[in-house]
């Protein structure tokens, strides 16, 4: 640390140091030894897939059978293996939906149908739930398997949009009901209820994380489909092996930067950056995109910490100018520590350029570089606020903070390596224009960060967060602010849900990519800022995803 402070003639005491903890993983992910049994597992998975495709098609004349099969396929995290089959099944279910709901008073089936169809953009009406009202402020709970039905209703409410009062009321009712009966429930229902109430609904949970949990829950149900369960286990482990190989490759690259010794002031978070990338898309066909995103996020994290936790104002001006110019000749003008980060930035994007040429989409390199410049400008503006000890209003803060959260840059980076049929030039322009769908994700990204991280930021010289801005501006306490921000995030989720309803401007897979980025944020900030402070909860998730195979 002292070496770099001396290199620019600045003492450590005058820098906004954050004292981040070191990497918790050591060299655990550098070496990867593939298992010899993978070829046999892959062959077995292919055989099961063929059989299950046939079975799903045969279920087309049985509404409930097809409905439950699609739900299981999605919850088990294997829907990417059945994209066309699931699309066809949902089209079939949509055509039968109105007639089914008219002649059926099954709360569970109605809610499940509604959720599955809404998830895929079908404009099904929330009026199907009117028949379950009890004439007061609540809903009639079925006598048999009431908790299971109400749980599915609770899950369905997370697909609501603005103006759907029946679902707003149902959200409160179902949550309160499940909380009141939870102590009387047995597993596996109790586990599902606990997860939905205290962790994530299916709509907001990260697919790969939720699949890992659901596999063990699904297995406990006597009615589980043995073929689906076996395929889910095989596929999870095969994809995990791919992720381990990618993470090993990224870890070896990261080690060459010598972050712990040469950049000891930054967050050493390569593994967590890869988690973020695999959260956006875990599927094997996104391997190139995932590798681009993981490295891009790792470098963005270094940049963030240079601006936020070490650089002086004068140094940051030089750094920003160098990023704007994007030229190796700028290296000579930068302090030693900045040279490492700047060279890493240029090197990564040189690799990205090569990959994009292979993909036949070289035009995307421009957008990737513009996204990094976009972040640098925002970080610099925040540094100027810090230098001037500026106290922004909440509105002024949010205008800048929805840029400094890095989420626009994240989305652009996540699109770079995706196939052309999903991402186009128009899609990049759309993201940069910040339409309501993107704006909603930015609000969630910023507020969830500030709610969990503002106490840490108060410990050092830092621009105040949305929490402090709102408290001072409205003369209210922290709890009132947090409550208000959660309401704003619920409103933003409604905007996201609205953005999925057909007709859509861009392909549903692109919208899901963006949605998954929001879901990843929610996971990371569930127990505080688990990217900055990698605690037991985040460590356990990473172990479950990359280190511990699902037992057969």
UniProtKB/Swiss-Prot annotation:
Its EC number is 4.2.3.70, 4.2.3.87, 4.2.3.93. Mg(2+) 2 binds at residues 304, 308. Optimum pH is 7.0-7.5. Optimum temperature is 40 degrees Celsius. GO terms for molecular function: magnesium ion binding; terpene synthase activity. GO terms for cellular component: cytoplasm. Pathway: Secondary metabolite biosynthesis; terpenoid biosynthesis. It catalyses: (2E,6E)-farnesyl diphosphate + H2O = patchoulol + diphosphate; (2E,6E)-farnesyl diphosphate = alpha-guaiene + diphosphate; (2E,6E)-farnesyl diphosphate = delta-guaiene + diphosphate. GO terms for biological process: diterpenoid biosynthetic process. It is found in: Cytoplasm. Mg(2+) 1 binds at residues 304, 308. CDD domains: Terpene_cyclase_plant_C1. Keywords: Cytoplasm, Lyase, Magnesium, Manganese, Metal-binding. Its cofactor is Mg(2+); Mn(2+). It comes from the Eukaryota. Mg(2+) 3 binds at residue 457. The Asp-Asp-Xaa-Xaa-Asp/Glu (DDXXD/E) motif is important for the catalytic activity, presumably through binding to Mg(2+). PANTHER family: (-)-GERMACRENE D SYNTHASE-LIKE ISOFORM X2, OS04G0344100 PROTEIN-RELATED. Belongs to the terpene synthase family. Involved in the biosynthesis of patchoulol. Also produces at least 13 additional sesquiterpene products, including alpha- and beta-patchoulene, alpha-bulnesene, seychellene, pogostol and alpha-guiaene. Homodimer. This is Patchoulol synthase.
């Amino acid at each position: 640390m002292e070496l770099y402070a001396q290199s620019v003639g600045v003492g450590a005491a005058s820098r906004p140091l954050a004292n981040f903890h070191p990497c918790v993983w050591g060299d655990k992910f550098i070496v990867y030894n593939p298992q010899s049994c993978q070829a046999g597992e892959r062959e077995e998975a292919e055989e099961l897939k063929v059989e299950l495709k046939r079975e799903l098609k045969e279920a087309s004349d049985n509404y409930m059978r097809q409905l439950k099969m699609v739900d299981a396929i999605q919850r088990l995290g294997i829907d990417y293996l059945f994209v066309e089959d699931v699309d066809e099944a949902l089209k079939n279910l949509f055509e039968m939906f109105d007639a089914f709901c008219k002649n059926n008073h099954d709360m569970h089936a109605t809610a499940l149908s509604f959720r599955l169809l809404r998830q895929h953009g079908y404009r099904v009406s929330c009026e199907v739930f009117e028949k379950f009202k009890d004439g007061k402020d609540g809903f009639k709970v079925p006598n048999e398997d009431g908790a299971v039905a109400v749980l599915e209703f609770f899950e369905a409410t997370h697909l609501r949009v603005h103006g759907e009062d029946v679902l707003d009321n149902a959200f409160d009712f179902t949550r309160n009901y499940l909380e009141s009966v939870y102590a009387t429930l047995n597993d596996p229902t109790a586990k599902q209820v606990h997860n939905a109430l205290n962790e994530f609904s299916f709509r907001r949970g990260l697919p790969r994380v939720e699949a890992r949990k659901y596999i063990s829950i699904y297995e406990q149900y006597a009615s589980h489909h043995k073929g689906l369960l076996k395929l889910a286990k095989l596929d999870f482990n095969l994809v995990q092996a791919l992720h381990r190989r990618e993470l090993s490759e990224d870890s070896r690259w990261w080690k060459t930067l010598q972050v712990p010794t040469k950049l000891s002031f930054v967050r050493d978070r390569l593994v967590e950056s890869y988690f973020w990338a695999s959260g956006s898309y875990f599927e094997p066909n996104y391997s190139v995109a995932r590798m681009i995103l993981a490295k891009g996020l790792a470098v963005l994290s270094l940049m963030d910490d240079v601006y936020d936790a070490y650089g002086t104002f004068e140094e940051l001006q030089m750094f920003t100018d160098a990023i704007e110019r994007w030229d190796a000749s700028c290296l000579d003008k930068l302090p030693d520590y900045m040279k490492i980060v700047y060279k890493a930035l240029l090197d990564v994007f040189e690799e990205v350029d090569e990959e994009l040429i292979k993909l036949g989409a070289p035009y995307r390199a421009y957008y990737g570089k513009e996204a990094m410049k976009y972040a640098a400008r925002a970080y610099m503006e925040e540094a100027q606020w810090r230098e001037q000890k500026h106290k922004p209003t909440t509105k002024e803060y949010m205008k800048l903070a929805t840029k400094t959260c890095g989420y626009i840059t994240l989305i652009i980076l996540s699109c770079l390596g995706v196939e052309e049929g999903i991402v186009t030039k128009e899609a990049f322009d759309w993201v940069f224009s910040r339409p309501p769908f993107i704006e909603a994700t930015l609000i969630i990204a910023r507020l969830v960060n500030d709610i969990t991280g503002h106490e840490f930021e108060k410990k050092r010289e830092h621009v105040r967060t949305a929490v402090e801005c709102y408290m001072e501006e409205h003369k209210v306490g922290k709890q009132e602010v947090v409550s208000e921000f959660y309401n704003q995030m619920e409103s933003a989720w409604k905007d996201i849900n609205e953005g999925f309803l057909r007709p859509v401007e861009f392909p549903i897979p692109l919208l899901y990519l963006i949605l998954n980025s929001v879901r990843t944020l929610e996971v990371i900030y569930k127990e505080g800022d688990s990217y900055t402070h990698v605690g037991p909860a985040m460590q356990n998730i990473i172990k479950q995803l990359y280190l511990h195979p699902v037992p057969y």
